[in-house]
């Protein structure tokens, strides 16, 4: 196999999910976002996972998600590894967020599979690769959360995605612990498997 040289150290450590921050009117709060980011910096965590499930991304507009990420990056001042979840329920918006995230200098982008309709695996791979192509210089993390997305990352789909050199690993929030072992074994040391559920912290 080819030897992949990449620095995965920046992904090793505690990377909490970033919570949605709103003002009293229910709008995204840039001040709140910056305050929470600074809190994480002070606590000494390795990084943050922005605009994921805890960030309520599926209820937010593209514009809101950009504002959140911009304010995280501003307050983090390079002290945190930032993984930005960019998936929307259409490729175009996802690509726009991916491109935006890369322009801000995030460490990685992440995406869940398309939700609602259960698409065949080749369509999921195309969706992910199209998003990744919009941020060609940025690491890509697959987000496996079958209980919410309705589709699971299979070994075949993972193998297909590893052909994309930007794919560095999986954020796994499926419940069976065996899944993590399985992905680890399949991918080897050049990939990182992030563990989603707190109760499986390793």
Model-derived regions: residue spans:
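Short, Lys/Arg-enriched N-terminal segments with co-localized hydrophobic residues
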Residues: 1-4
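Catalytic alpha/beta core domains of metabolic enzymes, predominantly
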Residues: 134, 146-202
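Active-site beta->alpha loop and helix N-cap motifs at the rims of alpha/beta catalytic domains
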Residues: 6-16, 21-152
């Amino acid at each position: 196999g080819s030897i992949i040289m990449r620095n995965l150290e920046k992904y090793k450590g505690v990377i909490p999910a970033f919570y949605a921050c709103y003002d009293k009117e229910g709008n995204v709060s840039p001040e709140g976002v910056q305050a929470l980011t600074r809190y994480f910096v002070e606590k000494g965590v390795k990084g943050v996972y922005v605009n994921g499930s805890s960030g309520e991304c599926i209820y937010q507009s593209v514009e809101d998600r950009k504002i959140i990420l911009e304010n995280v990056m501003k307050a983090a001042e390079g002290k945190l590894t930032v993984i930005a979840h960019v998936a929307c329920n259409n490729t175009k918006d996802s690509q726009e967020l991916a491109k935006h995230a890369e322009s801000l200098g995030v460490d990685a982008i992440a995406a869940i599979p398309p939700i609602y309709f259960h698409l065949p695996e080749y369509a999921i791979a195309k969706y992910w690769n199209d998003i990744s192509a919009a941020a060609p210089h940025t690491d890509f993390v697959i987000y496996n959360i079958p209980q919410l997305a309705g589709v699971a990352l299979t070994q075949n789909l993972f193998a297909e995605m590893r052909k994309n050199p930007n794919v560095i690993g999986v954020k796994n929030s499926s419940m069976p612990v065996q899944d993590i072992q399985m992905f680890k074994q399949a991918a080897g040391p050049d990939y990182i498997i992030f563990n989603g559920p707190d109760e499986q912290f390793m």
